[in-house]
Structure formats: C-alpha cells, structure tokens
Curated annotation (Swiss-Prot):
<comment type="similarity">
    <text>Belongs to the peroxin-19 family.</text>
</comment>
<feature type="propeptide" description="Removed in mature form">
    <location>
        <begin position="297"/>
        <end position="299"/>
    </location>
</feature>
<dbReference type="GO" id="GO:0061077">
    <property type="term" value="P:chaperone-mediated protein folding"/>
</dbReference>
<dbReference type="GO" id="GO:0005778">
    <property type="term" value="C:peroxisomal membrane"/>
</dbReference>
<dbReference type="GO" id="GO:0006625">
    <property type="term" value="P:protein targeting to peroxisome"/>
</dbReference>
<keyword id="KW-0963">Cytoplasm</keyword>
<dbReference type="GO" id="GO:0005654">
    <property type="term" value="C:nucleoplasm"/>
</dbReference>
<dbReference type="InterPro" id="IPR006708">
    <property type="entry name" value="Pex19"/>
</dbReference>
<feature type="compositionally biased region" description="Acidic residues">
    <location>
        <begin position="12"/>
        <end position="27"/>
    </location>
</feature>
<feature type="region of interest" description="Necessary for PEX19 function on peroxisome biogenesis">
    <location>
        <begin position="2"/>
        <end position="91"/>
    </location>
</feature>
<keyword id="KW-0597">Phosphoprotein</keyword>
<dbReference type="InterPro" id="IPR038322">
    <property type="entry name" value="Pex19_C_sf"/>
</dbReference>
<feature type="modified residue" description="N-acetylalanine">
    <location>
        <position position="2"/>
    </location>
</feature>
<keyword id="KW-0576">Peroxisome</keyword>
<keyword id="KW-0007">Acetylation</keyword>
<dbReference type="GO" id="GO:0005829">
    <property type="term" value="C:cytosol"/>
</dbReference>
<feature type="modified residue" description="Phosphothreonine">
    <location>
        <position position="236"/>
    </location>
</feature>
C-alpha cells in the first residue's frame, strides 16, 4: 500500500515537472518573438499605440534584415532558420519584380563588409546608414499621414520607370520620399542657380570649340536648368498639397530631360557641392534611387 502511494506521489511529481517544463518552454518562445517595439523596422514609432502594420513595413523589415547572423541575434536557432527561409523567399520574389532594388541592397551589404576594423570608417558608415533610415522613416510616416492615395503616388512616380505591381506599389511612398529629398530646393537650387547664371558666358566663349551637336545639347540643358530654377523660385510656404504635387511631377519631368541631355561642362559641374557633383546617373531617375551607387543619398 505504501509502495502504491509512493508510486502515485512520484507520478504527480513527474506531471508537475513536465508542466513546469512546458510552461518554461512557452515563456522562452514568447520571449524569442520580437515585440513591435524591438522588431527590426525602419518605421517611426507611433506614440498612440500598436497599429496594424502596412505591407510596405513588412517588406522593409525583410529587406534590411539581410544576414542570417542578424536573425540569430534576435531569435533562437529554430526561429532564426524560419526567419532566414522567409527572407530568402521574399528576396527571390523581389528579385523577379525589382532586380535593381535587390542589387542596391547587395551593394549596401558589400559596402558594410568593406568597412573593416577602422573605428572612424565604421562610425562614418553607421552614421550614414542611421541617418538614411531615419530620414526614410520620417518621410514615409509623413506621406502616409498626408492621405495621398497609391494612385496619386503612381502618377507622381510614373516617370521613374516603375510599372504598377503589388510588390512595387508598396514601396512607392519610400521611393517618393527619397526623390523629394533629392529634388528639394535646399539641395539643388543654390548650385543650379549658380550654374545657370554662368552658363550663357560659357556658351559664348566655347561655341567655336564645341561640336555643333554637343553645343546644342548644352543650350537645351541651360534652358531646362532655367525652368528648374523657376519651379524652385515659385515655391511658397502657403502652397497647397495639390500645388506641391504638381510641382514635384514637373520637377521629375525636367530632371529626366536634364538627364537625357547628359552632363554639363566640367568647368560648370565643378561648382556643384561635394557629394552631389551633379551626377545625374547616380540619381538613377529611371529606376530605384541608389541602384547605380553605394553613396548615402539622404544626409
């Protein structure tokens, strides 16, 4: 009888230990799952509380979590494998829809790998990346709160060579925020205005030494630059959203015209500020910004 009671006690103790083990495993699983506050995202935090994540946010999370080591730091081994598989799947789908965008992130990864152990270079790369992501998050949030529809964004971005598609439409707000930063008055106007003022004298002094076809392109280029400056000069703090959108579309069109005409004369392009150098190819207006370079575009 005593043996039976002892066996029963052992069984109860085993059940209790099993229950505690299961509860511990569940607790560990819950701890392994990233909360919205710690999830790898470039979206700006919302003080009003957790909200449903947009498809674009999920895509951004997957794109920037580009190494398995990153997943290992956030999850246990099993969840890391699952996250890695999901990332690879997302990248394969993206590669079919936006090969240039995939190339951009591959170059970013390669650039990070070349930083090395030098403290100053690491700090510079980290600072550039942090400021870029912060700028994207801020502008993406502002665009989402502005009430602009995806149809309006598509119209504004159709000059970038981005055809409508499920995967591409979700990143349009980010792409537009990048272009708005690049085409802002603070970035372009001072140098463009200076070049525009010096262009007539350069054209006059180089007409005989410049091939006629190239000289005509320079004349057209000067004309387009004048129009761009006029667009900037027409800006006012009281412009409506409709006016701002119309001006942005006009600026995209003018910048594409400028890109088609090639680079300005080196003597004039040298007036551009360091880091910009009027490299229109680096802006890559016919595709996702940054696809042709590793430069930090938003500072």
């Amino acid at each position: 009888m005593a043996a039976a009671e002892e066996g029963c006690g052992v069984g109860v103790e085993d059940d209790r230990e099993l229950e505690e083990l299961l509860e511990s495993a569940l607790d560990d699983f819950d701890k392994a799952k990233p909360s919205p506050e710690h999830a790898p995202t470039i979206s700006a935090p919302d003080a009003s509380g957790p909200q449903k994540r947009a498809p674009g946010d999920t895509a951004k999370d997957a794109l920037f979590a580009s190494q398995e080591k990153f997943f290992q730091e956030l999850f246990d081994s099993e969840l890391a494998s699952q996250a890695t598989a999901e990332f690879e799947k997302a990248m394969k789908e993206l590669a079919e829809e936006e090969p240039h965008l995939v190339e951009q992130f591959q170059k970013l990864s390669e650039a990070a790998g070349r930083v090395g152990s030098d403290a100053s270079s690491q700090q510079e790369f980290t600072s550039c990346l942090k400021e870029t992501l912060s700028g994207l998050a801020k502008n993406a949030t502002e665009l989402q709160n502005s009430g602009m529809s995806e149809e309006e964004l598509m119209k504004a971005m159709e000059g970038l060579g981005m055809d409508e598609g499920d995967g591409e439409a979700s990143i349009l707000p980010i792409m537009q925020s990048i272009m708005q930063n690049l085409l802002s008055k603070d970035v372009l106007y001072p140098s463009l205005k200076e070049i525009t003022e010096k262009y007539p004298e350069w054209l006059q002094s180089h007409q005989d030494s410049t091939p006629p076809e190239q000289f005509e392109k320079y004349q057209q280029q000067h004309s387009v630059m004048v129009k761009i400056c006029e667009q900037f000069e027409a800006e006012t703090p009281t412009d409506s959203e409709a006016t701002q959108r119309a001006r942005f579309e006009a600026m995209l069109d003018l910048m594409q015209q400028l890109q088609a005409l090639g680079h300005p004369p080196k003597e004039l392009a040298g007036e551009m500020p360091p880091g910009l150098n009027f490299d229109l190819d680096a802006l890559n207006l016919s595709g996702p910004p940054g696809a042709n370079g590793e430069q930090c575009l938003i500072m």
